[in-house]
Amino acid sequence: MGRSMVLISAVVLAFLVAAPIPEVTAKKYLVGDKKFWNPNINYTLWAQGKHFYVGDWLYFVFYRDQHNILEVNKADYEKCISNRPIRNYTRGAGRDIVPLYETRRYYLLDGRGGCVQGMKLDVLVETPPPPPPFTPPPPAQ
């Protein structure tokens, strides 16, 4: 009986080791890269070619006494209206994050005058792609 338990344990362990584990990694995006969250930056161009997925997050670096990060609706985004935000992501440090928890479009802007100078970002968050199919290793010879 002891030998069969060892054999069963070995088979279960081998299965667990060989089973594919989906890679779940959130990505942190530094908004604007080394230019950060500042006026006169084309954030539409910055976002081009990037795929934002549920679980990712946007990291904003800015002068805390000059700028902020507000989420607004599409109409307010297009007109740079900031007096009725959906959410204020500013925490006061000038190093703030926007977690992307939902598959939807996020309209973000600076509500302290920077929006009219280009400080606005439209991000479409997608469902993460499925993990690649598991290919079992070739049998040992």
Curated annotation (Swiss-Prot):
Segment forming the signal sequence: 1-26
Cystine pairings recorded for this chain: 80-115
GO cellular component: apoplast
Lineage top rank: taxon: Eukaryota
GO molecular function list: electron transfer activity
Pfam families: Cu_bind_like
Sites where a glycan is attached: 42, 88
Domain Phytocyanin: 27-127
Keyword Glycoprotein carried by entry: yes
Keywords tagged on the record: Disulfide bond, Glycoprotein, Signal
Keyword Transferase: no
The protein's role, per its UniProt record: May act as a carbohydrate transporter.
Record PANTHER family: BLUE COPPER PROTEIN (PTHR33021), EARLY NODULIN-LIKE PROTEIN 19 (PTHR33021:SF285)
Protein family (similarity comment): Belongs to the early nodulin-like (ENODL) family.
Protein name in the entry: Early nodulin-like protein 19
